[in-house]
Amino acid sequence: MSSYQQNPIGSFGGLYGSGGIEKSSQIIGNYRLDKTLGIGSFGKVKLAEHIRTGVKVAIKILNRTKIKNLKMDEKIRREIQNMKLFRHPHIIKLYEVIETTTDIFMVMEYVTGGELFEYIVKNGKLLEDESRRLFQQMISGVDYCHHHMVVHRDLKPENLLLDPINKCIKIADFGLSNMMQDGDFLKTSCGSPNYAAPEVISGKLYAGPEVDVWSCGVILYAFLCAKLPFDDESIPMLFKKIREGVFSIPDFVSPSCADLIKKMLVVDPVKRITIHEIRNHPWFQVKLPKYLSSPHTFLSKSIQTINNSILNEMVQVYAPIDRERIIEELQKSGEVNDLIVSYHLLVDSKRGSYENEINSPNLVSPITTPIMSSAQKSPIMFTTTTGFNPSNSNSISNNNNNNNNNNNNTTNNNNNTTNNNNSIINNNNINNNNINNNNNNNNNNINNNNIINNNNNNNNNNNNNNNNNNNNNNNNNNNSSISGGTEVFSISPNLNNSYNSNSSGNSNGSNSNNNSNNNTNNDNNNNNNNNNNNNNNNNNNNNNNNNNNNCIDSVNNSLNNENDVNNSNINNNNNNNSDDGSNNNSYEGGGDVLLLSDLNGNNQLGGNDNGNVVNLNNNFQLLNSLDLNSDIQTQPHRKWYLGAISQLPPHEIMGEIYRALKKVGFEWKLTGPYQLRCRMVNGKPIKLVLQLFRVAENRYLLDIKKIEGEIFIFFDICSLMLEELNL
């Protein structure tokens, strides 16, 4: 046998790393073709055998001409790339992609049990325990794909294959089916519309995982009843039933299961139960296998631990290649070669029950996608647990309950320093606002978003030399992120650059004073003054001028002084008292605050990472904060935001967004649930990301973020966009 040489990369190779192509009537690459298993939208599905290992695979053949005629080539590339990321026990695996001049060959896992639809037709309704077991597997696979930002949109029993060896189901065609063009459901779906959500058959624009939740509800109903909740020989009557959402559940279905089905088959997609809520439903939790108990228990795509028995078999199959060379090829990251494919084929062909493999070293936790956080309340990826009250600092959630004070600030030990941070505490030997005294008063952390004003009479100082015997661990970190985070609130701009907010601080220690100071034109002649003033004449050392525009992002100008720290009498024996001395200034996405108004005059918001504020009126004219004389090379990288609030339903908002984008001259693509990536058709160097968030009940935020281009072009474009939008 000749020595092993890696096959040349095909035309898809740069993206997929597929092997070389040998095509005859029976051979494609390293596979020998066999009988036809079925015919799909783009071509046939063939049974094949991997020549080296003898493992059976299914090869989906996609005809290039059909793909081109349907204008689906770019979507095919993107969805194939998504599918190659999937390594889940209940999703059909895609091992590699081979390309010829006429066809694309997707080498996939072969499952021998056939379609679940045929099983139900043959055996009738399933027992509730069996239905629950299969439903748990299906939801786990759907949840995994949603975490990878792929929505199926055509789930049905025909796309669920039975694996008789492992006694489980596997989702097929996941990722390819969501290439359907909106409004063309009946033309592109070769199956029945009985499983489609109301928003799909109505031709409304949709983008989220809620359509899969509906389909899963219909499938669960079919498991239990061997019939469909919505069925009619007349397609118009069928659509009418689906839109109305009226169905009956037989008495033999348990009340808990019936409750879950009803919550999944809610016509309004916003009110429909989410995957996360399904996982927590009492009926779903019964007899839930350990390996399905967490959405983050997935098989790793990379080979982290090599199975010795599989390795020994490969040494024999690929002789005379030595063992070390095989190990080297298997451990190559971000690459697919024949040895890696062979290893996965052998592992999968010998794998027993997945329930026995939960402790396998190949089981890892995936990277969680922020926009699909399981903690979200609805399919739209943004929630808030508090009202829009800018005057109440307690309305901002505290996400840090330990003793590590991650600061949004900088402690300065220099003289005459000017700072534009949210808050400054200036004291020698005090780092990161964390003060440790040697009199059992430990870890008294000053809230970062505060301002200390010390005038001539040393206000807010407790002259007891810190002789407190309280063992308090007071952490007042408000990790609030603005645009793209978990808290949203509105701010009213003051054109005099004075922002007043009476905040109620948190006090856990004794002798606590919570002050909100905003003084002007003060002459301070003392040391260690921390001023939040305009036009101050300071004649002292260690003066820190915290000029203008502070504490805007957190809407909190209060001082939370735990045990009232005396700035001139601190007995500190440690110059580095914080466990985490890093600056934590970056909100998600970064950017400066943009205060603007919607068509109703309501103030909107943006994100800030350094306290600077850009005030915009309805014409989006820049008022302040931009230093036009500074060297752009010396400025930190910023991402700019604009936004608009609406109370329209999400699908209507998305429809209005599409209309406005087309009117202004954008082209776009869907990159996630309720998320669009846009660029100008006329070639203007500007790229945007649009994201729709739910910020309250029946209240939605359209966030517009610049990811490329000049800031003033961004302002002009957004001005046109927001004028065009009718929200």
Curated annotation (Swiss-Prot):
EC number: 2.7.11.1
Positions where Phosphothreonine occurs in the chain: T188
Protein kinase domain mapped to chain residues: 31-284
GO terms assigned for molecular function: AMP-activated protein kinase activity; ATP binding; protein serine kinase activity; protein serine/threonine kinase activity
Stored SMART domains: S_TKc (SM00220)
Residue ranges annotated for the KA1 domain, each copy included: 679-727
Compositionally biased tracts (Low complexity): 391-483, 494-586
Annotated Gene3D superfamilies: Kinase associated domain 1, KA1, Transferase(Phosphotransferase) domain 1
Keywords assigned by UniProt, alphabetized: ATP-binding, Kinase, Nucleotide-binding, Phosphoprotein, Serine/threonine-protein kinase, Transferase
PROSITE patterns: KA1, PROTEIN_KINASE_ATP, PROTEIN_KINASE_DOM, PROTEIN_KINASE_ST
Active site residues per record: D154
Gene Ontology annotations for the cellular component aspect, listed alphabetically: endocytic vesicle
Catalytic activity: L-seryl-[protein] + ATP = O-phospho-L-seryl-[protein] + ADP + H(+); L-threonyl-[protein] + ATP = O-phospho-L-threonyl-[protein] + ADP + H(+)
Disulfide bonds: none
GO biological process: asexual reproduction; ATP biosynthetic process; autophagy; cellular response to diterpene; mitochondrion organization; negative regulation of asexual reproduction; negative regulation of gene expression; phagocytosis
Disordered: annotated segments: 382-590
Residues annotated for ATP binding in this entry: L37, G38, I39, G40, S41, F42, G43, K44, V45, K60
Family of the protein in this entry: Belongs to the protein kinase superfamily. CAMK Ser/Thr protein kinase family. SNF1 subfamily.
Subunit structure: Heterotrimer of an alpha catalytic subunit, a beta and a gamma non-catalytic subunits.
Stated role: Activated enzyme phosphorylates target proteins and initiates downstream signaling pathways that shift metabolism from anabolic to catabolic pathways. Acts as a highly sensitive cellular energy sensor.
Protein name: 5'-AMP-activated serine/threonine-protein kinase catalytic subunit alpha
Organism this protein belongs to: Dictyostelium discoideum (Social amoeba)
